[in-house]
C-alpha cells in the first residue's frame, strides 16, 4: 500500500488559472468542463484536482512512469471522485478531496 498527499493554496490557483495554457497542459477536457461549470467555486475545484493529481503521482509513481496529464478524475453517479490513469479507471486507487476557503488537500491510497 502506498499513500500520497498534497496541499495547495487556492490563491495560487487564482493566478495560475488566468493562463489558459496551464489549464490545458494539466487538466483533461472533461475536468476543465466540470470545474468550469462550478462558477462560484471553480478555482477550488481546479485546485483540489491538481492536488489530487499530485497525491496520486506520489502514491504510485515510484513504480510507474507517469506525467500529470496521465492522471484525471471523474465523479461516480454518487458524486465520489474516481481516479483514471491514461483514460482507464484505476480501481486500485482511492482518492479523497477536501477544501476550505484558503486551502485544498487531497489524499490518495494505492493498493498496487
Tell what function each PLM region has:
Residues 1-112:
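Core catalytic alpha/beta fold that binds nucleotide/phospho-ligands
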Amino acid at each position: 500500500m502506498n499513500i500520497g498527499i498534497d496541499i495547495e493554496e487556492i490563491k495560487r490557483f487564482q493566478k495560475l488559472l488566468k493562463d489558459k495554457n496551464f489549464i490545458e497542459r494539466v487538466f483533461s477536457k472533461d475536468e476543465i468542463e466540470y470545474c468550469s461549470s462550478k462558477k462560484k467555486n471553480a478555482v477550488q475545484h481546479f485546485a483540489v484536482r491538481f492536488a489530487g493529481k499530485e497525491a496520486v503521482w506520489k502514491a504510485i509513481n515510484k513504480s510507474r512512469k507517469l506525467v500529470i496529464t496521465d492522471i484525471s478524475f471523474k465523479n461516480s453517479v454518487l458524486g465520489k471522485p474516481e481516479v483514471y490513469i491514461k483514460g482507464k479507471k484505476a480501481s486500485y486507487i482511492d482518492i479523497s478531496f477536501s477544501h476550505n476557503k484558503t486551502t485544498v488537500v487531497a489524499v490518495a491510497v494505492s493498493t498496487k
